[in-house]
């Protein structure tokens, strides 16, 4: 896959996608009513901000592919939901899982 400074191999892209999937999964654990108690010491807002900055860096490196726009939109919607007084974990979860599914579209040439 072409990027700003050259080319990433298919295995590099696959490895990165796997790591990004794992980072997105943590977003679920941090807010899941069944597991959130285990992560009280985690600064969720900071984790989220750092993750978004990392995705923004990828966005620039890959010359702004469409799936990353969608990923960022879904994640921002999840974050907004997480900050509401009437936080609905299922709504939040749906946004995160939608973003999770879009990760696999990064690098697909036929994505428009």
Regions from the language model: what does each represent?
Residues 72-112:
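Amphipathic alpha-helical binding modules
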